[in-house]
């Protein structure tokens, strides 16, 4: 299936030669195996909410990760597929009165993308709730699922080991806290209202474009430039 990159968040860019949606680990593994066998380039994406595509498009196969299952390990710990949208994860956790993910509910994109960039907002970030992540190393000749713990993610500001690693995240295990459902929902609503007030969420936008400086506010510098 040919897919226009302009269908994604920024509404720009050329077509992908072949566009597929992958809904299981088996489909992910088979796609890697097949493209390697026939020598076709393969590019994985999440929700397409944090990428810019050139007008010439993308050669080869673009595979969108659409996995969407989750399993509880115990009352406050669960493993979630990387293809789940952050908004969906927030809803799942709200339904089970689990707190700790509210900060990410309005961040566009998938859980896999949030882990990759150590997404954060309102004083919280993914490194605070990630237990482990399973992934496939695309530089390895062998197609196998590996797992790393929290420390091995090498989390830092908007960065993880996956930022510079050619890998596809399969799923992530999160540990949350038992909370009050009403309070969690109120926090979710407040965070979303705050985003609506400060960001043009009805326009092509991926939220923040620039990293925060250590001793300056990026937005202030842009304003001062005129």
Per-region residue spans from a language model:
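Anion-binding (especially nucleotide phosphate/pyrophosphate-binding) glycine-rich loop
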Residues: 1-111, 115
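Phosphate/pyrophosphate- and phosphate-bearing ligand-binding catalytic cores of soluble enzymes
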Residues: 9, 51, 142-226
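Conserved active-site and cofactor/substrate-binding residues in soluble primary-metabolism enzymes
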Residues: 23-26, 84, 88, 124, ...
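A generic local secondary-structure boundary/capping motif
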Residues: 51, 90-93, 102-105, 118-125, ...
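Contiguous, small/hydrophobic- and glycine-enriched helical/loop subdomains that border
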Residues: 72-77, 81, 86-87, 100, ...
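Short, well-ordered alpha-helical segments in soluble proteins
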Residues: 93, 111, 115-119, 134-137, ...
């Amino acid at each position: 299936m040919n897919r226009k990159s302009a269908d994604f968040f920024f509404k720009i860019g050329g077509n992908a030669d072949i566009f597929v949606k992958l809904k299981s680990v088996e489909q992910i593994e088979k796609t890697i195996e097949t493209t390697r066998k026939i020598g076709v380039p393969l590019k994985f994406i999440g929700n397409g909410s944090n990428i810019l595509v050139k007008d010439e498009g993308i050669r080869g196969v673009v595979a969108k990760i659409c996995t969407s299952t989750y399993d509880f390990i115990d009352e406050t710990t669960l493993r979630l597929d990387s293809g789940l949208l952050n908004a969906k994860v927030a809803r799942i956790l709200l339904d089970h009165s689990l707190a700790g993910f509210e900060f990410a509910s309005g961040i566009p994109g998938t859980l896999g993308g949030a882990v990759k960039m150590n997404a954060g907002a309102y004083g919280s970030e993914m490194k605070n709730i990630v237990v482990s992540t399973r992934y496939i190393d695309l530089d390895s000749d062998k197609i196998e699922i590996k797992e790393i713990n929290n420390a091995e993610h090498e989390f830092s500001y908007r960065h993880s080991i996956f930022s510079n690693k050619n890998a596809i995240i399969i799923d992530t295990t999160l540990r949350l806290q038992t909370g009050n459902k009403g309070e969690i929902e109120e926090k979710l609503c407040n965070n979303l209202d705050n985003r609506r007030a400060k960001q043009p969420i009805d326009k092509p936008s991926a939220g923040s474009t620039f990293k925060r400086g250590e001793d300056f506010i990026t937005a202030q510098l842009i304003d001062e430039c005129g």
